[in-house]
């Protein structure tokens, strides 16, 4: 970073790398004039693991366990976009029950990262108590994940054409109980935080991003919706079975850190609304006995190549990517998570390009923090919600 001659009395401070449980291994080189920020340069790459090149040397089925290490707090979304890409290329139909289960898991996986965003964000601006509150609700979500997938994190639950296993007996009732419980806790968060005068003093009018500025920078997710743009890929791309549910896109028009907070709080409420509707319409009810259904169905007169390759065979199945290219995206908690996939009639992808929302959103903080106070850096950075696993890949 070059320092101008007129800034010879300025101070250069290195902030970070931060602990992975907070904002990840991100380093900021900040140029200060007293408490005023003159310049800020983010240093990335500390968590780079070559995820794109690894994908090109694995089959898609072999690569599935790797993708949960991108955004390690919202692993269902990385799995979803990974299986959606070959499903689109191969025109594979997903059963309605599996699609409903996917939606339920995705929305639970949206709430959990928003909770883990809220706790450190409040800690960044000096309020420690909410961190303990969000841990209480987040543990219940992880209990539901563990019961359904066997893992609290890094679930490896999605499969090409569906999910790994059906929901266990009694899981849907437990999930409905959580929905009733969690809404009261969101109201508790709002009573505790939203109208707190000290909180408002720290976030209101801080880190303002205008509508056109958000579009020009390619922002997505809560960063985009907090700037007055009603853009949500669940409404735009019509993936899974989101079109069958009644829910609203959460957005604000102020574009500041408070607006980004309000968008995420609203999204948690909308996620509960989607989960309740999915649990209500899921085919087969609380537990579907697939073995009994298969016996009742009898033998199919036509050869089912998909079932032979993905269900009947004991060895690890393979999926040959057709010689096409496709861009698939999902609405992750942090924004648009996309994959550009190029196939060449091989079991290995020819190109696997990851479009992480955090990497794009992290380009704008240097513009936001200029002329702000040093204490506002953590407010702005916290409101963006950064996970370096997906930024560095």
From Swiss-Prot:
Q: Does the keyword Membrane apply?
A: yes
What is one Gene Ontology biological process annotated in the Swiss-Prot or TrEMBL record? photosynthesis, light reaction
Q: How does it sit in the membrane?
A: Peripheral membrane protein
State the protein's name: NAD(P)H-quinone oxidoreductase subunit H, chloroplastic
Q: What does this protein do?
A: NDH shuttles electrons from NAD(P)H:plastoquinone, via FMN and iron-sulfur (Fe-S) centers, to quinones in the photosynthetic chain and possibly in a chloroplast respiratory chain. The immediate electron acceptor for the enzyme in this species is believed to be plastoquinone. Couples the redox reaction to proton translocation, and thus conserves the redox energy in a proton gradient.
Chemical reaction(s) catalysed = a plastoquinone + NADH + (n+1) H(+)(in) = a plastoquinol + NAD(+) + n H(+)(out); a plastoquinone + NADPH + (n+1) H(+)(in) = a plastoquinol + NADP(+) + n H(+)(out)
Family annotation (InterPro entries):
NADH_Q_OxRdtase_suD, NADH_UbQ_OxRdtase_49kDa_CS, NDH1_su_D/H, NiFe-Hase_large
Q: Per the UniProt record, which EC number(s) apply here?
A: 7.1.1.-
Tell me the classification of the organism that encodes this protein. Eukaryota, Viridiplantae, Streptophyta, Embryophyta, Tracheophyta
Alphabetically, the GO molecular function entries are: NAD binding; oxidoreductase activity, acting on NAD(P)H, quinone or similar compound as acceptor; quinone binding
| Principal subcellular localization | plastid
Instruction: State its location(s).
Output: Plastid, Chloroplast thylakoid membrane
Return the broad EC class: translocase
Keywords linked to the UniProt accession: Chloroplast, Membrane, NAD, NADP, Plastid, Plastoquinone, Quinone, Thylakoid, Translocase, Transport
């Amino acid at each position: 970073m070059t320092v101008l001659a007129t800034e010879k009395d300025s101070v250069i401070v290195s902030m970070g790398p931060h602990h992975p449980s907070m904002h990840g291994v991100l380093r900021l080189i900040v140029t200060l004039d007293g408490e005023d920020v003159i310049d800020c340069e983010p240093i990335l790459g500390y968590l780079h693991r070559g995820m794109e090149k690894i994908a090109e040397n694995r089959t898609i089925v072999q690569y599935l366990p790797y993708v949960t290490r991108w955004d390690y707090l919202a692993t269902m979304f990385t799995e979803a976009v990974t299986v959606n890409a070959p499903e689109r290329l191969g025109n594979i139909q997903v059963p309605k029950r599996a699609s409903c289960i996917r939606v339920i898991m995705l929305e639970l996986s949206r709430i959990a990262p928003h909770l883990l965003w809220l706790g450190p964000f409040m800690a960044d601006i000096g309020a420690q108590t909410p961190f303990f509150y969000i841990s209480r609700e987040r543990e219940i979500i992880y209990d539901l994940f563990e019961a359904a997938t066997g893992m609290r994190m890094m679930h490896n639950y999605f499969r090409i054409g569906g999910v790994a296993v059906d929901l266990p007996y009694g899981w849907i009732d437990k999930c409905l109980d959580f929905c009733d419980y969690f809404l009261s806790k969101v109201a508790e968060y709002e009573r505790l935080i939203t109208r707190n005068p000290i909180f408002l003093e720290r976030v209101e009018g801080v880190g303002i991003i205008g509508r056109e500025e958000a579009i020009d920078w390619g922002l997505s997710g809560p960063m985009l919706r907090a700037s007055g743009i009603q853009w949500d890929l669940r409404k735009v791309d019509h993936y899974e079975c989101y079109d069958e549910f009644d829910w609203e896109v959460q957005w604000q028009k102020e574009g500041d850190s408070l607006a980004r907070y309000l968008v995420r709080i609203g999204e948690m409420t909308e996620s509960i609304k989607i989960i309740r509707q999915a649990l209500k319409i899921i085919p087969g009810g609380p537990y579907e006995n697939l073995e009994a259904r298969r016996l009742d169905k009898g033998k199919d007169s036509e050869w089912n190549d998909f079932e032979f390759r993905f269900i009947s065979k004991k060895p690890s199945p393979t999926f040959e990517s057709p010689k096409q290219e496709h861009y698939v995206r999902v609405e992750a908690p942090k924004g648009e998570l996309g994959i550009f996939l190029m196939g060449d009639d091989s079991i290995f992808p020819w190109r696997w390009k990851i479009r992480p929302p955090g990497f794009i959103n992290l380009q704008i903080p240097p513009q936001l923090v200029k002329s702000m106070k040093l204490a506002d850096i953590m407010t702005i950075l916290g409101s963006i919600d950064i996970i370096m696993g997906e930024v560095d890949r």
